[in-house]
Each structure stands twice: as C-alpha cells, then as structure tokens.
Amino acid sequence: MQTTAVVLEAPERLTLRPLALRAVEPGDVVVEVDYSGISTGTERLLYTGTMPAFPGMGYPLVPGYESVGRVVAAGSGAQDRIGDTVFVPGANCYTDARGLFGGAARRVILPSAKAMTVAPALGPQAALLALAATAYHAIAGGKPAELIVGHGVLGRLLARISVALGGAPAVWETNPVRVAGATGYAVTDATADDRRDYASIYDVSGAADMLDPLIARLAKGGEVVLAGFYDRLSFGFPPAFMREATIRVAAEFKPADVAAVTALIADDRLSLDGLVTHVRPAAAANDAYVTAFGDADCLKMVLDWSDVT
C-alpha cells in the first residue's frame, strides 16, 4: 500500500511525494486523512533543523500530529471501526521515512486504540484537538491559570479552557495583530500589568528568555508552567528561591485529555471557532508551511487532502 505524504527531506526542504506503507496488523486501522494541521512549535523546529536531538530523530521524516479523517479499512480485529471519523495523533507507518510524527499524509496506518472517534461535523476544526488536549493537559496537572503568556492558538485554547473550567485568566501578548479575539478574558501587554502576586503563570510563547521576568511576577509558592517547546532554559536562582517557586514542564497530551476536551466541546463549553484561520490544499504544502511559520495573521494552518489521491 502507498500514500502521498508531506516529507521533510532535510531542514527547509519539503516535498509532497509517494511513500510505501507497512503492512496492516490485525489491530490497525487505515485512515484516509481529510485535514492535517501544521504545528508552529515542534514542526517549526523540525522544518528549520533546530529541533534538539532525541532518540529516533532524523530525516527524511513525515511531520504532523493533528490529522482527522475516516477509517476506510482495518485489520481483522478492528473491522468495527470502518466508517468512523477519527482524530489521528500521528502515525509511524512508513517504510522509507520516519514518522515524526507522521500524520501529514493522505493515508495512514495506526493502531485502532490510538484513533479517537470525533464528530464529523467538526470538519477542519478537529485538527485542533491535539492543541486543545495539550492545553487541557497543562491545566489539569497543576493550579488554575491566572496568567497566560502568548495569545496564539495554544494561548487562546488555554484561556478558553480556563474560562470553561471557571477561571478568569489574564493574557499577555506583545504582537498587536494577535490581541483581538478574546472571549471571557482580557488581553494586555506586560508593561500594562503591574501584578507581582500570580499564583500560576502559563507560558506558551516558547521564548527562552522568559523565566526571569515571569518568576519576578510570582507570589510566594507560585508556579511557572512551561507549556511551549524550548531549547535551553536558565534563570537566576535567588528570585526563585525567595519565592519558593515551582517550575513545571507540561508535556504531551494523553487520550484522557482528548476525551476531556471532546466532552467540553460536546457540552458547548468550549468553542473552536475562529482558530483555524488558513486552509490550503495539500498540494500547496510548501507555501502553506512558509505562511504558517512566517505570517502573524495565521493562527492555525490546516492542509486539505481532498484533492490528493
């Protein structure tokens, strides 16, 4: 079996080409992808070649962990999934490319247990479930968010989920293009905020130089949550010591986090409206990646695979 996939042959060298797929196992499903999102965090690092080394890292690779599509075939133990609309959090199914994280392809193979059923009506918004689950995972692991740093799509999801759970976070954003779009919370600049008693600060800016200024805004016993993706980080110890600060790293989401945000959406407590700002055909993947990483007006870029065989 073959598929057509986005392939990063090397940093900043992207192609759309056929790839061979591994054999289908009894517990697998074959998903025909309708939409896949482009991550401006991990995928940007893979695209630019600045991703810190980790086991399994290397090129060529198929990126993507934000795909949605329909189960069109399955192994003998998963026949009941055929016809389901599912969210695909990545796939490692290619014989001649690495799956990091493998979701940006027209057809993918993955274990049935990892393909999460979603409402077909979500359409391209279903590609946001990975980010929504990432935001929920960060919040569920600690104190409610009092301050969120960054009003990109992940920051907006953090804020919306916080409001849905009864919170009232403040949000900082330095780019005037991204200040608009708040519902149920206020967006401001750090220079207009003189608070220095935040119990919890969630950073989704990904900026490596944010720890010192954020620690300075904490109350005693406060927490800074690193919900972005960073290279090397450092901070001055005395201010953190004086505040007895906690620095927590929020890692990848779990299936329970996807289930939680899916329930919030189903109960009309969480809206994904206004977050997918750009949809491009998969055949225009090169231009789509450039726009996703370079255009501040692009909150979320989604590839449409409907015209790819």
Please describe what each predicted stretch is.
Residues 147-148, 203, 226:
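Hydrophobic Val/Ile/Leu positions in short beta-strands of Rossmann-like dinucleotide-binding domains
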Residues 35, 89, 202-204, 305:
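Short, well-ordered coil/turn residues at beta-beta hairpins
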Residues 208-269, 305-309:
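Glycine-rich phosphate-binding loop and adjacent beta-alpha segment
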Residues 22-38, 50-92, 121:
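Glycine-rich beta-strand-centered segment in the early N-terminal region that forms part
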Residues 86-149:
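NAD(P)H dinucleotide-binding glycine-rich loop of Rossmann-like/cofactor-binding domains
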Residues 122-194:
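Mid-domain Rossmann-like dinucleotide-binding core that forms the NAD(H)/NADP(H) cofactor-binding site
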